[in-house]
């Protein structure tokens, strides 16, 4: 019995080590501190790579290694992981609401959205896993496009400070439209890919974690707030007098190459939002394998815990 307990503890410890490694990369609160600074200092291409691809590898690592290698320990750890994810959702949204640097704002939105990813992984059913896949694709497109646009704005205004922006809607033709479109996608407007991913995750999580799911749904209000702040400060109002001296008027609008890059991301988001079944069919077999290896273990763990409690009472008597 003692050897069995040590084996269980060892597996749990190994699982925690794997989890911490991937949690830093995802990132999960409170291991997130590197991401806003990394985005703020990185060039546009680096931010696009980081937001669009690299942080998604952590979610892949959790799915590919942590859940299959340590299903029992993962099932025991699920509630704690979801609490960390929920804290990250609110913390990221609240910090994004307070930012004045455009890239730091977008970095905190990624922290908030990765909380949904953690909720999806540890809720552990086919709906959340499929929603996770759609959300990673959609977030990769929308966040990458917004980091591209932050670079485009910086080339024209020589600043990322939202307090020094304003009035772009009246000076440019294409940039305001794309900025509003991708912000709408990021906050989960229906008809675009992010909405499908969030909807599937929340629907799949509700049966087992109704309270956590309701709280995660409330956080979407903060997403709308930071999205509106970004759009209002950048596009509306009057141009900041302090900033006018740093660029020549009129501003140069997006080139055909820049529009083409953004159109690719926009088409992908619309496709994900209108016809996600294309991607769901491809991922279904892999996600079902994960469900089969994880969900039964959750049920076994609950049964074993109940049996152990009953045996303890019998021994005491």
Feature annotation, model-predicted:
Residues 1-5, 9-233:
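Hydrophobic transmembrane alpha-helices and their helix-loop junctions in integral membrane proteins
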Residues 172-175, 228-317:
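Cytoplasmic/organellar membrane-interface segments at the starts of transmembrane helices
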